[in-house]
Amino acid sequence: MIRHFLIFVFIVTIFFSSCKTYYMPVGTFLEQVPTLETVNLRQVTAQDPLGHKHTYSVYPIDSIKCFDKDGTPYKLKNGPSIEIRFTDINGRRSTFYFDRTWVIQDSVIGVQSKILSLKKAIPVSTIKIIEVQDGRKKYKYINQ
C-alpha cells in the first residue's frame, strides 16, 4: 500500500514539475528578436540562485509569442529562466537562454550557460524547429 502511494506521489511530482514546451516558427522568432542593428536594448539586473547579481542588455520583450502543441497562440512571460532550443536541418540541438539570445546579421547568437557565458552561433537559414520553455531555474530580474 505504501509502495503504491509513493509511486503515485512520484508520478504526480514528475507531471507537475515538467516544463511545458511551446513552439515558434522562424518568422515569428525574427519578428520578436530583430537584428541588433535595428533595436534599442534595455539594461536588466538578474539574480542567480546563489544570490549573485549580473547586469546585461536584453531585447525589450515582456512576453514571447509562441504556440502550444495544438497550434493555439500563447504568450509566455519573458524572464531570465526562459530557454529557447533551436534544432537545425541536421537534427542538432542548441539551447540558449532567451534573454541572452541575439540576431546579428544572418545568425542567431546565444549564451548556453549563464555561469560560464558560453556563446554559440547558428545560421538562421539552417534553423528547422524552435522550442521555448520556462526552465524553472531560480533566476529573477531584480530591477523591473
Task: Describe these PLM feature segments.
Residues 1-5:
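Positively charged n-region of N-terminal signal peptides that target proteins for export
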Residues 15-18:
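C-terminal motif of bacterial Sec signal peptides marking the signal peptidase cleavage site
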